[in-house]
Amino acid sequence: MKLLIVDDEELTRTGVISSIDWKALGIEEVLQADDGINGLEIARKYRPEIILCDVRMPRMTGIAMLEKLENILPDSIPIF
């Protein structure tokens, strides 16, 4: 399973990644993006099953990104 973490704060992304044993939860790959536009590109390319996303980010909000992904990745689980 793949997880995508989308947040404009690098410290938040690295903190979430390093503080949880993702492999123990069945997450084999943790991807990250710094805003909604990059998150959209990475999600289209890698097709993560879970997307952990900040709501307020520059360039594209998390909500706008997930609205665009709704038809592309209908089975992905978004978490805000």
Features from the language model and the residues they span:
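A short, hydrophobic beta-strand element within the central beta-sheet of small alpha/beta folds
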Residues: 75-80
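Non-catalytic signal-transmission and effector/linker regions of two-component phosphorelay proteins
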Residues: 1-2
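Conserved catalytic motifs of ABC-family nucleotide-binding domains
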Residues: 47
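Active-site residues of response regulator receiver
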Residues: 7, 54
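Two-component/phosphorelay signaling modules centered on CheY-like receiver
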Residues: 10-31
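Receiver (REC) domain active-site loop signature in two-component systems and cognate sites
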Residues: 57
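Acidic catalytic/metal-coordinating carboxylates
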Residues: 35-38, 61-64
